[in-house]
């Protein structure tokens, strides 16, 4: 009798856990349920309106997990990549180079995240309660490189480039990248294939 009474609760807890697990990282199931992995420019996934009222519960959960500000279009476009130009995962024992062109936008930047969707920290300077400034050090801002629309840029990604402007550090962790384009030209919404995503070129590996 006790088991019968508890069965609905056990089933509910089990289903809750199983429905949450796919959203602990960028997975095929999460991409399918949210639609966030179905639209791509090269290997960069995009979704043009994270802040739409029409989002389903899976999309809202995924946006919260990724820590992206759910700004409505046409304020921001987010693109994410987890593989290089060869289709290989972005791993912590290799160095990479981003080669791209400045987008038509008010502001743009790259952020690097671990596969747990958290900012990566310097293992030699870990902080239990990192400040915004600590985490923002792991962002490569467009204004550090060039503000000229259409100009080419290069960003190095390696184990520890924390003190180098216009670079990103993975500290030996597997990772994914987020390209954030704020105040984008509306032409990108009409034709997303025109979004100038960067090439992700693998360099030396240990």
What are the roles of these predicted feature ranges?
Residues 1-206:
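A compositional/structural signature for long, glycine/proline-rich flexible linkers
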């Amino acid at each position: 009798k006790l088991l019968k009474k508890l069965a609905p609760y056990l089933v509910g807890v089990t289903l809750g856990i199983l429905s949450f697990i796919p959203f602990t990282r960028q997975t095929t199931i999460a991409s399918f349920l949210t639609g966030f992995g179905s639209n791509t420019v090269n290997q960069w996934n995009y979704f043009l309106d994270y802040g739409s009222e029409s989002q389903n519960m899976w999309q809202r959960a995924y946006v919260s997990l990724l820590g992206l500000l759910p700004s409505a279009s046409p304020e921001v476009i987010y693109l994410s990549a987890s593989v290089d130009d060869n289709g290989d995962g972005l791993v912590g024992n290799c160095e990479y180079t981003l080669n791209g062109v400045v987008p038509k936008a008010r502001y743009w930047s790259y952020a690097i995240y671990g596969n747990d969707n958290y900012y990566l920290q310097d293992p030699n300077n870990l902080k239990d309660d990192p400040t915004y400034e600590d985490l923002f050090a792991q962002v490569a801002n467009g204004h550090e490189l060039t503000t000229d629309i259409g100009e080419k840029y290069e960003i190095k990604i390696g184990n520890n480039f924390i003190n180098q402007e216009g670079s990103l550090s993975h500290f030996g962790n597997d990772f994914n990248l987020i390209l954030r384009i704020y105040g984008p030209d509306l032409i990108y919404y009409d034709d997303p294939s025109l979004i100038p995503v960067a090439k992700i070129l693998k360099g030396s590996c240990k």
